[in-house]
Design a protein with these regions (language model features):
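Short, glycine-biased loop/turn motifs at secondary-structure junctions and
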Residues: 1-161
Length: 161
């Protein structure tokens, strides 16, 4: 039985950086040796990590749930704390995630994942409140102020409480 790894991949209007188009429910294959950062269908196990490679502030960015299989190369960047990133010879596009699904997934992650997500994905005011209500730590408020509201002084402000 073939190992399948579920993960997430970002596209620009369902096109990759080479302008290849992808469709929901279809499987794709690439020949040749698979190596992360070189060749293969790249995806991340953790949703927040896709924003290392795609701009989540761009309204054309689409986030998909995918399955990678076939030949798989795993990459971990311990220095920056990115783990379980893959390149695979085969990929299936399961579905496009709605904003609600993205928030539902990310809200159940740890605080470091939330910080990474806030720094890479444009949130609505309602989504900011959902995150602030779940994570009441001051650092989350600072991340939202800095990355979402462009407040360059967010990390130097003294809070009154």
């Amino acid at each position: 039985m073939m190992n399948k790894i579920k993960g997430y991949k970002a596209y620009n209007n369902m096109n990759d950086r080479f302008n290849n188009s992808y469709e929901i429910g279809k499987e794709y294959y690439i020949e040749g040796p698979i190596k992360f950062k070189e060749r293969g269908f790249h995806f991340c196990k953790n949703l927040e990590d896709v924003f290392r490679y795609y701009n989540g502030f761009d309204e054309n960015t689409v986030i998909c749930e995918v399955e990678g299989f076939g030949e798989i190369d795993t990459y971990n960047d311990e220095y920056y704390g990115y783990y379980d990133m893959y390149a695979s010879s085969n990929i299936k596009i399961i579905k496009v995630l709605s904003r609600e699904e993205i928030i539902d997934i990310i809200i159940n992650r740890n605080i470091d994942s939330i910080k990474r997500f806030i720094s890479g994905f444009k949130l609505t005011e309602e989504e900011e409140l959902i995150i602030l209500n779940k994570f009441k730590e001051e650092i989350i408020e600072k991340y939202i102020d800095y990355y979402q509201k462009n407040d360059e002084k967010a990390f130097t402000k003294k809070r009154s409480w």
